[in-house]
Amino acid sequence: MSLSDNFADSLISAPPIRVICLVGPTGAGKTAAALHLARTFGGGVVNADSRQVYRDFPVITAQPSPEERAVCPHLLYGFLPSTEKISAGVWTDKATVVIEELCREEPGHNTSRQATSRPDGLVPLLVGGTGLYLKTLLDGIADIPRVDPAIGARLERECDALGAPALHARLASIDPDYAARIHPNDRQRAVRALEVHEGTGHALSWWHARPVPRPRYAALRIGMDMSLDELTPRLDRRIDLMLEAGALDEARAARTVCDDPAAPGWSGIGCAELYRYLTGELPWAEARLLWLRNTRAYAKRQLTWFRADKRIHWVRPDDLDAMAALACAFLRGETAE
C-alpha cells in the first residue's frame, strides 16, 4: 500500500481538508492571485498544470519564477524529465501527499495570515488549468482497470507512423466528448484514450462519468473571469516575454537532454512549435503564429471546461480583495464551497 493510499484511508472518517483552487485559462493571472492569497492566509501552492511538471521547460510552460517561489512553498513544479509520462491518477497521488505536508507546515515570515478558524498549517492552494487533474483529485474518478501495456505500445508505434492528428481523428469517432477536450497534437492523451477504449471496451469519457467515492476535500473554486477576446493580446504579449526570458535557448538546451519530439515533455504548447522551428520544419514567423494560435485554442478549451462547472466563483483577475473575501469566508467555515 502506498503512502497516498494510507492517507486516503485515514480520511474516511476525518472531516474533509479545505483547499482553495485557482482555475481558468492559461495566461489569465492565476499565479498572481495565488501569491496574494498565500501572503494573506499563509498558503502553499500546488501545481495543477500538466505541462508545468516538466523540469526542462520552466520558461515555456510559465512556471513561477524564483522570486515568486520565494513567497511560499511551491510543490509539484518541474519534477519530471521530458521522457516521463504523467496521468491524472499519478498527479492525484502526488498532490494528496503534498497537501497533507502543507497542512502540517507553519507559515513563513513572508505571510501574515488573517484570522480564520483554520488550525495550524498552510492553506493548500491548487493552481492550474488542467481541469481533469482537479476533477480527479476533488471529485474522484472511476478506477479504470489495468490495460495490457502491449496495446499502448502498439498505439505509440501507430502514432509514430501516422501522426497524432490521425489518432485524434480515430478517437473522435469513438469518444467525441473526450476528443473535443484535447488538442489534435496531444499524442499522450489520444493514445491513452484509445488504449482505454480498446482494453476495456468503454470510452474514457464513460469511465470519467462513473460514480466515485466520497470526496476527500472541501474545495473553494475561484475562476479567473476573462473572455477569450480579452485574453488573446495578453497571450501574444506573454509569448514575447517568454522569448525575452530565454525560451529559445531553453528549447535548444532541452534538445540536448531529450531530442525526441514525441516525448511527453515536448508535447506542451510552445515546446512543440519551437522544436519544429529549431529542426527547420517551420520558419520563425509561422512557428510563432502557430504558438499563439494553439495557445488561444487551448485557452478556449479551458474556458469551455471550467464554465461548465457551476461550483466555480468567477472573479476578475485584478479583484484580489474579492478573492480574499471568498477565501476568508470559506476557511472560517461560513460557506461550504
Curated annotation (Swiss-Prot):
UniProt keywords, alphabetically: ATP-binding, Magnesium, Nucleotide-binding, Transferase, tRNA processing
Cofactor: Mg(2+)
GO molecular function, one term: ATP binding
E.C. no: 2.5.1.75
Pfam families: IPPT (PF01715)
Region ranges (Interaction with substrate tRNA): 49-52, 188-192
Sequence positions that bind substrate: 26-31
InterPro entries, alphabetized: Dimethylallyltransferase, IPT, P-loop_NTPase
Catalytic activity: adenosine(37) in tRNA + dimethylallyl diphosphate = N(6)-dimethylallyladenosine(37) in tRNA + diphosphate
GO biological process: tRNA modification
Amino-acid positions noted as binding ATP in the UniProt annotation, renumbered to this chain: 24-31
The protein's enzyme class: transferase
Site note Interaction with substrate tRNA, residues: 130
Summary of the function given for this chain in its UniProt record: Catalyzes the transfer of a dimethylallyl group onto the adenine at position 37 in tRNAs that read codons beginning with uridine, leading to the formation of N6-(dimethylallyl)adenosine (i(6)A).
Complex and partners: Monomer.
Family membership noted in the UniProt record: Belongs to the IPP transferase family.
Record's protein name: tRNA dimethylallyltransferase
Biological source species: Nitratidesulfovibrio vulgaris (strain DSM 19637 / Miyazaki F)
